[in-house]
Amino acid sequence: MSYVDAGFILSVAMFAQLPATLSAHALEKATGGRGLLIVMAMALAALSCWGILYLPLDWAVWMAILFGLATGTVFSRGMALMVERARTPSEAIRLSGMSQGIGFTMGAALSLLFTSFLHQGGSFLPFCLVYTFFCVLGMISGRMSAQPGYL
C-alpha cells in the first residue's frame, strides 16, 4: 500500500468516528446498557484492525469505516462515563486526567512496541496481538466501569 493510500485509509477511519461519536448515546439506549455497547465496540475495533492488516486491500476502506465507528463509539462513551460517574466537577477533572495519562501512556507503548516489532521481524502479527490485548483490557474495564456504584 502506498503512503497516499494509507493516508486515505486513515482519513476514512477518522471521518467515520464522527457519526459514531454523535450517535453513541442513542446506540447505548438501543443496546440496553453502556457495558454491552463498549464490549461490542471494542470487539469491532480489534476485528477491524485485523481486517485492515490481513484482508485483501479491497476490504481496507470498509474495515477503516468499521474501525472509525468502533473507536468513535468507545471514545464518546468513555468521556461520558467520567462525567456520569463523578460526584463533583473536580472529581470529573481528576478522572479525566487519570484516564488521559493512562491512555496516552498505553498509546505510546503500543507505538513503541509496534515499531520494535517491525524492525525485528517485519510482521504485523505482534502489533495485532498487542492491540487485541489492549482491546480486551478495554472491554473488561468498560464492563466494570458501566456497573452502578463503580466509583
Each model region followed by its residue ranges:
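Multi-pass alpha-helical transporter architecture, strongest
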Residues: 123, 129-151
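Juxtamembrane helix-start elements in MFS-like secondary transporters
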Residues: 2-10, 92, 96
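Paired small-residue
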Residues: 58-67
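A late C-terminal transmembrane helix in Major Facilitator Superfamily
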Residues: 86-123, 131
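Intracellular juxtamembrane helix-capping segments at the cytosolic ends
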Residues: 73-87
